Structures are given as structure tokens and as C-alpha cells.
Amino acid sequence: MGKVVTLGEIMLRLSTPGNTRFVQSDSFDVVYGGGEANVAVSCANYGHEAYFVTKLPKHEIGQSAVNALRKYGVKTDFICRGGDRVGIYYLETGASMRPSKVIYDRAHSAIAEADPCDFDFDAIMEGADWFHWSGITPAISDKAAELTKLACEAAKRHGVTVSVDLNFRKKLWTKEKAQSIMKPLMQYVDVCIGNEEDAELCLGFKPEANVEAGETNAEGYKGIFKAMAKEFGFKYVVSTLRESFSATHNGWKAMIYNGEEFYESKRYDINPIIDRVGGGDSFSGGIIHGLLTKPNQGAALEFAVAASALKHTINGDFNLVSVDEVEALAGGNASGRVQR
């Protein structure tokens, strides 16, 4: 297994119980999560030496976030302690035709105001096999964008494979700001992960699909994958393809391109969805594990898609599944029968 490093923000997630609306709720369910933190948990569950890099306050809420990571085997040696705030997000889980809603309260969080001197990225990347980040981190603040660049530069100095999940968040920045920051960072990236909306808004590649209508067109991606690989020199371009029938019923598959061949995964019909937050992150964790351990891109992709399908059945941000569970589903065991 490898040493995997991720950089980003872990937040306090406050979600309404069940499918109640914000205006109805008298209480919140509390967990922790965040894009790159979720990926680190997945990698730790699969047996990798997973490190999460961030900055968290020294108070009890900051420590609780650290404890949440340690609980699932993520190494916290490179978490800087300081600052005043842990970012928060509020989640209202949708149902049927009513979509889920997220409200962010993350401005001026510790990682958003972190300085380069808070991290020794050369020490962090020493001996690492993989570094993962997402487009959420540079969107948090200009300081976080600079940290992302410095981490990528250190990763390249140490010969570390770099992956990005483009992860566009319209509540954090505009597509113009996103492209001005993200495009220059692509020079450091080996593996680019993103869906149809991310490719368009972060990098300017428009697929032949109606995202809002829940359409996915695998054939329409091939030209885009080739163009992305040619422009930025990616070793792999990977995309999930989600068919959204309702908030609780999705079709789910993915494609990968290695510069020569395309591979499209099997499709999963996920119904009912228990919690789709973290679904993309679980896919990223799966593709990292797959590309580090599997014999070819097809096997890597099948592992990632199965891992992510399982995440949709688990409450919370983290994908709490084992390699054996993922491989059982990837191998065709989707019956859901009791394991005795």
C-alpha cells in the first residue's frame, strides 16, 4: 500500500434529521466531513498510509475534527493547529423531486487564513506515492489557492503522482475565477477527475449533455477527454456519469481515458439513496486505490464506481467500507442479502 497525502478543509456538518427542512428542524445531526478529508478516510480504510493536511483551531471543536479523522485511521501529523474557526456547512437532505440543499458558513476558517509558513510541504511529500486535492480548496480563499500551488510544486519535486477532483462549487467562486486559478494548476496534475459540469466550469470544456436535466452521454465525453489530455498532459482523465431521476434515485457509472484507450464501467441503479454527500469523494478515493493497486485502468475504475455506489447507502460524509466489500459489489454481488 502507498503513502497518500490530501490537502483541504474538514468541516462541521450540521444536517437536519431525516428529510426535514431547515425551517422545520429543532436540532441537527453532527458529523465531520470535507472533500479531501473524505478521500483520506477512504484511502485509510483501504489500507493506505493516509495523511490529511489542514489547519484547525486548538479549541475543542478543532480537536473533535482531528479525532474524527483519527477514528478511521487517518494520520494527522501534518495538521497545523491555530486560527479561530472550523468551517461549518448545513445540510437539508432532499427527497423525490425536492433536491438537497447546502448552506456554507466557512468564511475565515483556519485553513482559509493559513499561511505558507504553517506547512513544510517538502517534509510532507517525502516518501509519498500520491497527492490529492480538489477545486474546493483553492476556492476557499486566495491563501488556500497559494497553499495548493505550493503543495503541488513540492509533490512534483518529490516525484509524487498528483490527482485533482475539479469539484466546482458555485457558492464559493465564479467560473471566471475558477478557470483563472485552476487552469495554471493543471500543469502539476497527472490524474484529472471531474464530472461534466466541472469540466466546463473549471476548464472550459463543454460536453454534449444537459446536466440540469440529469442527462449523461458517454460518447460525448470522448472528444473532451482527448482534448483535456492533449492540452494539459494528463495521464488519466476520469469522469463520473450520474443520471438523476430524483433526489433518492440515481444511475451511476464512470469513464476513464489513459491517452490511448477509453473504458466505461458497469452502471449501478442506486435506489433509494441514503446520503449522496461524499459520493464523488468516495469515487476519488476508489480511483486512487485502484490506480495504485490494480493491474489496469478498467479494474481501477470498476473498484472506484463500486466504492462510490456503496457510499450512497451510508450516512455521513465518510465512505466506511472495506476493500472486500467493494470488490464483492464490483464482482457482481449486489443482492444486499444478510452476510452470515
Please provide the spans of the model-predicted regions:
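Conserved phosphate-binding/catalytic loop of the ribokinase/pfkB sugar-kinase fold
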Residues: 92-145
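A short helix->loop->beta-strand "cap" motif at the edges of active sites that frequently abuts
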Residues: 154-161, 232-235
